[in-house]
């Protein structure tokens, strides 16, 4: 193994070397575990360490390669997963103390796909309680690798921290209202939130069924896409998994963004983003234009109602997901999740239906916008990553700010690709996103990869 460890390789480059016998999966894994032992005490991103299981996986993979067998596209790649995905024989806590003894009997479809592709699963990662808003005992918040005093995101906090902190080569996360995008922004990761239905949710702990998306974190868009290409696709055990072919993401990475029509709503962004964020976005758009994209000014449909409607839709569906344990075990729930569940339980059918109708109207307006452009460029966070102290005093304005550029696209189900495009005066990451048409993740990947071929923000690493 290189002295630099797995962090020195791309996902596909590492897998090729393992498959060719130039590196062994066992050596790659031990190098990765050495980094975990060195860095994890400062980061606190892991709930369940899976190293012994991983060692058995790596040994089996090396034996197959020694016999001359063909192996999958993620051969030997160390990947960590958010602790909402079932792994047979291990607990799926979903960040909740009441689920510490909830032992999975089968594997999630995503886990099956990863292991069939040769990935080595190393850990189950930290998250907020019930995949929602706050970290609760016995599972503390992981620490931002750039600054322990700053927020690490929610709910896929462990996935963002582990990826940027060097605990894995790539990670699996999920998003319901911003839970991939916000940790990517807080920690400076590249990530993909695919279209709703692109990835099976079988064996995944549910927050809100029609809002939940499983996605990927990595150090580059190309790496995140390589992992997404493995976990995506139809699944007979999840009838909501779309019956659509998975794009050729390797071809997309090579294609570039020549001819892409990129929309930007300058007024909407200016109303919700500070100067540093807006300036960094302008620079990113200029790079994409230099790479061949055409930039067009657009008007995004009003998202004001969507931010708050998201909470109502999420609340009702979360109440359904927790009906076996709430309110029966109310004392085991934290205040944020309790508040959401109570909202869901008291909402009338007419109120909920009104939210669904507005949701469909918004989705239709976005779809109409995407007949004029291929993608939208926008921030993820419109303000600097907040401190942990500030997060203890969140108000409605801050909540709206967090969700302005995220949860409307969870209501609509449109895909997004997220990547770093700067750093602020405190040295913390600035991140932007490209949002596109349903099931056209490959267009976004092509543009994101083109941007990262021209810039090096995604290559910058915190000193640990």
Q: What are these model-predicted stretches?
A:
Residues 32, 54, 224, 262, ...:
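Residue-level signal for inorganic ion chemistry
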Residues 74-214, 267, 378-397:
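Short glycine/serine-rich loop/turn segments
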Residues 74-94, 254-266, 313-367, 415-429:
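Short helix-loop capping/hinge segments that flank enzyme active sites or metal/cofactor-binding pockets
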């Amino acid at each position: 193994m290189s002295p630099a460890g797995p962090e020195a390789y791309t996902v596909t480059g590492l897998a090729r070397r393992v498959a060719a016998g130039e590196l062994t999966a066992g050596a790659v894994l031990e190098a990765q575990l050495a980094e975990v032992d060195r860095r994890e005490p400062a980061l606190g991103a892991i709930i369940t360490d899976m190293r012994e299981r991983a060692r058995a996986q790596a040994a089996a993979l090396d034996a197959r390669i020694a016999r001359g067998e063909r192996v999958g596209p993620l051969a030997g790649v160390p990947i960590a997963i958010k602790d909402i995905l079932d792994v047979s024989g291990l607990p799926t806590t979903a960040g909740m103390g009441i689920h510490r003894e909830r032992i999975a009997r089968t594997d999630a479809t995503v886990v099956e796909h990863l292991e069939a592709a040769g990935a080595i699963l190393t850990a189950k990662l930290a998250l907020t309680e019930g995949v929602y808003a706050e970290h609760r005992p016995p599972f503390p918040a992981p620490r931002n690798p750039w600054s322990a005093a700053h927020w690490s995101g929610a709910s896929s906090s462990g996935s963002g921290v582990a990826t940027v902190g060097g605990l894995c080569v790539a990670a699996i996360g999920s998003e319901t209202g911003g839970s991939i995008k916000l940790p990517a922004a807080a920690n400076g990761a590249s990530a993909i939130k695919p279209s709703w239905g692109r990835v099976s949710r079988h064996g995944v702990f549910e927050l809100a069924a029609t809002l939940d998306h499983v996605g990927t974190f990595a150090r580059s868009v190309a790496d995140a896409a390589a992992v997404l290409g493995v976990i995506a696709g139809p699944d007979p055990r999840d009838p909501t998994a779309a019956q659509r072919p998975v794009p050729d993401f390797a071809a997309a990475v090579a294609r570039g963004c020549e001819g892409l029509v990129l929309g930007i709503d300058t007024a909407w962004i200016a109303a919700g983003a500070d100067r540093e964020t807006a300036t960094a976005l302008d620079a990113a758009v200029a790079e994409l234009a230099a790479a061949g994209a055409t930039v067009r000014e657009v008007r995004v449909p009003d998202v004001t109602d969507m931010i708050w409607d998201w909470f109502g839709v999420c609340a009702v569906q979360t109440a359904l997901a927790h009906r076996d344990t709430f309110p029966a075990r109310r004392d085991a729930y934290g205040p944020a999740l309790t508040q959401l569940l109570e909202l869901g339980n008291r909402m009338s059918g007419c109120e909920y239906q009104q939210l669904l109708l507005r949701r469909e109207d918004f989705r239709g307006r976005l779809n109409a916008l995407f007949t004029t452009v291929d993608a939208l460029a926008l921030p993820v966070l419109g303000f600097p990553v907040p401190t942990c102290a500030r997060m203890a005093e969140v108000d409605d304005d801050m909540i709206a700010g967090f969700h302005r550029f995220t949860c409307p696209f969870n209501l609509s189900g449109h895909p997004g690709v997220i990547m770093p495009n700067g750093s602020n005066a405190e040295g913390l990451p600035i991140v932007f996103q490209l949002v596109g048409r349903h099931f056209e993740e490959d267009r976004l990947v092509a543009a994101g990869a083109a941007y990262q071929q021209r810039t090096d923000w995604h290559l910058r690493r915190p000193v640990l």
